UniProtKB/Swiss-Prot annotation:
Annotated glycan sites: 8
Source organism: Myxine glutinosa (Atlantic hagfish)
Function: Terminates signal transduction at the neuromuscular junction by rapid hydrolysis of the acetylcholine released into the synaptic cleft.
Bilayer disposition of the protein: Peripheral membrane protein
Similarity annotation: Belongs to the type-B carboxylesterase/lipase family.
Name listed for the protein in its UniProt record: Acetylcholinesterase
Intrachain disulfide bonds: 153-164
UniProtKB keywords: Cell membrane, Disulfide bond, Glycoprotein, Hydrolase, Membrane, Neurotransmitter degradation, Secreted, Serine esterase, Synapse
Location within or outside the cell: Synapse; Secreted; Cell membrane
PROSITE patterns: CARBOXYLESTERASE_B_1
Active-site feature positions: 99, 226
Domain of life from the UniProt record: Eukaryota
């Protein structure tokens, strides 16, 4: 809250990112005091359950999924009902987030149960129609059962499975979350929002195509190098400790990991599109091409798609492309603007 306390101030509600797997609103990088002081706005942030504790889903059971989204919705409801006590205007609330936090903003735009609690939205480097941001109910069940199996819990009865999980320490559950992803992949997370027919009533792409979303002003944006951060966590040939010069062999090995559900035709199409055929063995170009594929597929194209759909239905849409590398960025130069 700015000092002196304002009257009827604009409110900004922040949702942190972290792949729906980790994070907290109390990190120094999310300190809202600077924004509040500079702009005279009230800045609110929240915590929400992440990982299996927030997004495990057994469709048809007492744990249908999306608990983390309901946490966010409850926070929005509280802000709507109480922010006037802090000098805020409940009719001037902007919801904003980054990465998975940005992908979290989208379901509130899509859900009629959340739409009344905010007026505008900002989505930074993520949206719900990205390939990593949701799963269908069948895949959600498979992941829940895989986690249960990794913890030695029964999987043939939902109630027994859940009772077994309830009895496990949270740290033990979290330690086994990575066991549910069956194929080597880049930019994928074990427990994410599920298309449950309630909070997310249909595929996000279908909802965007049909215009089933809050009609409002939208600001969206991406960074120049959206993919590089994720490459240093296991992509063949990549590391933050060297220049990550990528051979043709590593280039070809990376692509199925970037599109783990892709068939042979789609993989071949990606190779065709992103190969410099006059310099197939240029290690710098191969490195940059892989970074482009990861960023385009997982962030830039989905965000552009959402912006396009919103504009098609007559909404005011604003878009930014962030191209300025911070002088104090700790990552190597090859990772660019992240």
């Amino acid at each position: 809250v700015p000092s002196p306390r304002p009257q009827n101030a604009t409110v900004m509600v922040w949702i942190f990112g972290g792949g729906f797997a980790y994070g907290t609103s109390s990190l120094n990088v999310y300190d809202g005091r600077y924004l509040a002081q500079a702009e005279g706005a009230i800045v609110v942030s929240m915590n929400y359950r992440v990982g299996a504790l927030g997004f495990l889903s057994l469709p048809g059971s007492p744990v249908p999924g999306n608990a983390g989204l309901f946490d966010q919705q409850l926070a929005l409801r509280w802000v709507h009902g109480n922010i006037h006590r802090f000098g805020g205007n409940p009719q001037s609330v902007t919801l904003f987030g980054e990465s998975a936090g940005s992908a979290s903003v989208a379901p509130h735009l899509l859900s009629r149960h959340s739409q009344q609690f905010f007026q505008r939205a900002i989505l930074q480097s993520g949206t719900l129609n990205a390939p990593w941001a949701t799963v269908e109910d069948t895949e959600a069940r498979r992941r829940a059962e895989a986690l249960a199996q990794a913890l030695g819990c029964p999987t043939d009865d939902d109630n027994e499975l859940l009772n077994c999980l309830y009895a496990r320490p949270p740290q033990e559950i979290v330690s086994k979350e990575g066991d549910v992803v069956i194929e080597p992949s880049i930019f994928r997370f074990p427990f994410v929002p599920v298309v449950d027919g309630h909070f997310i009533i249909d595929s996000p792409i279908v909802l965007l195509q049909q215009g089933i979303f809050k009609k409002t002003d939208l600001l969206l944006g991406v960074n120049r190098n959206e993919g590089s951060f994720f490459l240093i966590y296991g992509a063949p040939g990549f590391s933050k400790d060297h220049e990550s010069l990528i051979s043709r062999e590593d280039f070809l090995e990376n692509i199925p990991m970037i599109v783990p559900q892709g068939n042979e035709v789609s993989v071949d199409a990606i190779v065709l599109q992103y190969t410099d055929w006059l310099a197939q063995n240029d290690a710098l170009k191969n490195r940059d091409a892989i970074e482009d594929i990861v960023g385009d597929y997982n962030v830039i194209c989905p965000v552009v798609e959402m912006a396009t759909r919103y504009a098609e239905f007559g909404n005011n849409v604003y878009f930014y492309f962030f191209n300025q590398r911070a002088s104090n960025l700790p990552w190597p130069q090859w990772m660019g603007v992240i």
